[in-house]
Amino acid sequence: MPHADAPRRRHTLVTLTAAGWRAAFARDPLLAADPCVRRWAEHGWPLIVRRASPDEAAAGRVPLGMPLPPSVGKRRVALNVAADALATVGPLPALADVRAAAPDAWQPALRELEALGARCGVPAHVFGSLAWQWLTGETYLGASSDLDLVFPLPDADRLAPLLDGLAAIDARAPMRIDGELLRDDGAGVNWRELQARLPEVALKTATGVELVSAALFTEAGR
C-alpha cells in the first residue's frame, strides 16, 4: 500500500521505517530518551492508530499509540508521525490467530466468539492486552484482564443475533468482553450500547466522540 494512501482509521496497526523512528526521536527528546520506547523501536513492534487531536488532524499527522506492558508500568505512549514514516499498515490480528496466547480458561468463550462471528459473517479482531501479548511476546494479560474485540458492522438481519450472542457469551465467560462494532470508515460504537437498544450511542471517530442515534450509526455503515 502506498504511504500516501495510509489510512488513519482507529484500530489500524502500523510499523515505522528506520527513518520514521529517527524523525520521531528527533521531534521528541523525551521519547528518544525513554529506554522502553527505544526497545520497542529496536524490535520493530507495531503501533496502533488512535484518535487524533485537532492539531494532529489539521497537520495531517498519523496519531499513534504504544501501550507498554505492565512490567514497565503499563504506560500509554502517544506520538504522531508523517504518513511517509509508515513501513507497513494492516488490520488488528484476527481472534483465530491470537487464541493460542490466551489463558486456558478463556478458550471455550473464544471458540464461541469465533463461531458467532462466522455465523454473522463478521470475523472478530482483537486489540488490548491479548493482542499486544501476541504481537510482542511480552506479558500483558493478568487475572483481571478484559477481552477487547472489534467486529465489522454486519448486515441488518445479522445485527441483533450478533449483539445478543455477544451478551450471552459475555454473561458466562470468565472475562469481560469489551469492544466495538466498526463501520467501513472506522467509526465505532461499543457493542453494549447497541445491545441495550439505546436510542443514542457514543460514536467514536478518527477525530472525536459524538452522540448520534443508533439508527444513524447502523444505517450509515452500509
Question: Where is each model-derived feature located?
Answer:
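Helical scaffold of the NTase/Pol beta-like nucleotidyltransferase catalytic core
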Residues: 1-129, 168-175
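Broad gene-expression machinery/nucleic-acid interaction feature
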Residues: 61-63, 144, 148, 176-178
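Solvent-exposed residues in well-ordered beta-strands and their adjoining turns
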Residues: 67-69, 152-154, 182
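Mature, function-bearing regions of proteins
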Residues: 80, 84-87, 194, 198-217
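Active-site nucleotide-donor binding segment shared across nucleotidyl transfer reactions
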Residues: 113-147, 151-157
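Short, conserved charged micro-motifs
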Residues: 156-164
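Conserved catalytic core of two-metal-ion nucleotidyltransferases
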Residues: 169-204
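Extended catalytic-interface subdomain
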Residues: 221-222
